[in-house]
């Protein structure tokens, strides 16, 4: 199974347009949205080509493939615009015998680990900083932000395919800063 992960689009049609190109190239079986879909929040500058309504339309195209969790900037108003559920604080996906705990990161994250078994991949966004590391028997995975990357990072997303987890450049799909790991 191939899964494409992204987070923190914050209503940027520019970022979602680039993501659409990556989805077409990657051809994922499942798309995981790790929160903060439409609103930029009071702490972030407006992202490139901010348009929450158009962003919702762009995301709804993939409504049958998306599993999403609620970010700290997501609200019931956002849910009214999106045609797939976004209001859960977490979800779990099993792929190729691997458990993924999906959350935005403002509640559960590498510093506040949920009660999960060793070997689980904790996938979250929120920080806008891509991460792929092992900690206390878990894999901590953050695909970064497609719209408002922080700490001098570029826009990124993530891919799970054939037992391999990676962070990739939104611009061209290349492996980002050697963030790739075999998970067996």
Residue positions per predicted region:
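Alpha-helical architecture
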Residues: 6, 70-72, 102, 124, ...
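Functionally constrained cores in energy, signaling, and assembly domains
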Residues: 9, 20, 37, 55-56, ...
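Histidine (H) residue identity feature
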Residues: 10, 40, 62, 104-106, ...
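Conserved beta-sheet core of the metallophosphoesterase superfamily
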Residues: 99, 106-178
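Core catalytic region of metal-dependent phosphoesterases/phosphodiesterases
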Residues: 2-95
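Non-catalytic terminal accessory segments
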Residues: 183-184
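Short acidic/glycine-rich loop or secondary-structure boundary segments that cap or lie
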Residues: 40-43, 76-79, 101, 110-112, ...
């Amino acid at each position: 199974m191939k899964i494409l992960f992204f987070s923190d689009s914050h209503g940027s049609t520019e970022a979602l347009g680039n993501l659409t190109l990556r989805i077409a190239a990657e051809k994922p079986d499942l798309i995981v949205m790790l929160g903060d879909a439409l609103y930029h929040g009071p702490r972030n500058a407006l992202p490139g080509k901010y348009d929450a309504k158009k962003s919702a339309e762009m995301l709804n195209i993939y409504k049958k493939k998306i599993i999403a969790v609620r970010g700290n900037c997501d609200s019931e108003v956002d849910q009214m615009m999106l045609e797939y559920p976004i209001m859960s604080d977490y979800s779990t996906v099993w792929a190729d015998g691997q458990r993924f705990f999906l959350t935005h990161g403002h509640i559960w994250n590498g510093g506040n680990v949920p009660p999960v078994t060793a070997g689980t991949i904790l996938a979250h966004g929120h920080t806008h900083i891509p991460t792929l590391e092992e900690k206390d028997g878990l894999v901590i995975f953050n695909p970064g932000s497609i719209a408002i990357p922080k700490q001098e990072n570029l826009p990124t997303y993530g891919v799970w395919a054939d037992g391999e987890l990676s962070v990739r450049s939104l611009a061209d799909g290349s492996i980002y800063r050697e963030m790739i790991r075999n998970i067996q």
